Amino acid sequence: MEERTRAYLRGRFGDHYRQASVTPPPAANEREWGFIPWTEGPGETMVRHRSLLDLGEIEDFLGRRKPRHVYFSAGRYDEPSASTMSDKGWRSSDLVFDLDADHLPSVVLGEDSYAEMLAKCKDALRRLLDFLEDDFGFDDLTIVFSGGRGYHVHVRDERIRHLERDARREVVDYVRGIGLEFDELVDEESVAGTAGRSSPAQKRTLSTEGGWSARAHRHMLAVVDDLLAMEEADALEQLQEYDGIGEGKATAALNAARSNYEQLEAGNIDVHPAFYQLAKILLHEVVAADNAPIDEPVTTDTNRLIRLPGSLHGGSGLEVQRIDRDDLDAFDPLVDPVPETFRGHDITVEVTDGGLVELDGDSFTLEAGNQTVPEHVGVFLMARGRAEKGKE
């Protein structure tokens, strides 16, 4: 990044911060703070181990220092400005989740556009919220667009604030479906008669109420619905695509599903041994489709620094923005986080990496060279290293 570009961005970030209202997190004075300034050279240098007392009022600090990135800790401490973690005196930590489009299995880097990556990340966010709200029963959630390629979720429920790393890793494993075994999801009870199996009879069911068991049940029923809507030959052919399912088992599983649909709806998967085997195989699809691929180190690290909502992301010029739960569906990460400071006027930039830019409801295909663009587009390009500031 050239000095002209760096000075321009730093100045405009400062203009934004002098007008912005930034709300600090709860217990802000108990947290460590860090920031990355606009420094020369290709790398970035983190300034950390600061307390709010060191920084002063957060809005004054932002307007004065005009930082490139701003962070606060998930952890709360006795001495947040101590230079070593052992001297800080850990009290508790928020449970923080990070979804980054770069790490999603569904994202094809180099092929998916920025908009497509963010759309896939929003789908993953919905799955994460399903786990947090329905499975864990958390309602004190703060949802944040990171300003870059993903989302953060902060849980500040008193019940989890004192969890240590191993317990937090169990939460990670649960939402990612790591180590999930089908037999753990199945309720088994002895019943009179054969229950579709040879005696002694055991009735094995998937819960329809919640958790991974209910997800497995919903997916199983969706597959059954698709199979029953097909021509029989097509359904049998599809069933035989699963490992271990030959023609005989495919026929038996399909007939059992057709004859016992109401039992399947109720969760009974013991309608036939072949169908039980199919249900077990489908678990792999359930985990792939329904897990939340969060960044594990962020959640397990009780000392993690995370972006400050209301600050600007120095790699995009977009605002790190809180999202009300009820507004999530309507939230557009390419429109809503565009700062008002950068709207309404054009600037000149020297584009070095042309291509598509989708921002603030518009789409631009830019070639390399001098270009006059809306300022929010120019800031985005410069922050991402795709342009330098041109002469006006």
Swiss-Prot record:
Keyword Transferase (UniProt): yes
UniProt GO BP = DNA replication, synthesis of primer
Q: Name one GO cellular component term.
A: DNA-directed RNA polymerase complex
Keywords of the record, alphabetical order, are: DNA replication, DNA-directed RNA polymerase, Magnesium, Manganese, Metal-binding, Nucleotidyltransferase, Primosome, Transcription, Transferase
Question: What are the positions of the active site?
Answer: 98, 100, 295
The record, for Gene3D superfamilies, names: DNA primase, PRIM domain (3.90.920.10)
> So what EC number does this one have?
2.7.7.-
A GO molecular-function term, please? metal ion binding
The cofactor required is: Mg(2+); Mn(2+)
Instruction: Name a Pfam family for this protein.
Output: DNA_primase_S
Could you tell me which InterPro entries the record lists for this protein?
Answer: DNA_primase_S, DNA_primase_ssu_euk/arc, DNA_primase_ssu_PriS
Q: Please verify whether the record's keywords include Transferase.
A: yes
Q: Which family does it belong to?
A: Belongs to the eukaryotic-type primase small subunit family.
Role summary: Catalytic subunit of DNA primase, an RNA polymerase that catalyzes the synthesis of short RNA molecules used as primers for DNA polymerase during DNA replication. The small subunit contains the primase catalytic core and has DNA synthesis activity on its own. Binding to the large subunit stabilizes and modulates the activity, increasing the rate of DNA synthesis while decreasing the length of the DNA fragments, and conferring RNA synthesis capability. The DNA polymerase activity may enable DNA primase to also catalyze primer extension after primer synthesis. May also play a role in DNA repair.
User: How does the record describe its quaternary structure?
Assistant: Heterodimer of a small subunit (PriS) and a large subunit (PriL).
- State what protein this is by name: DNA primase small subunit PriS
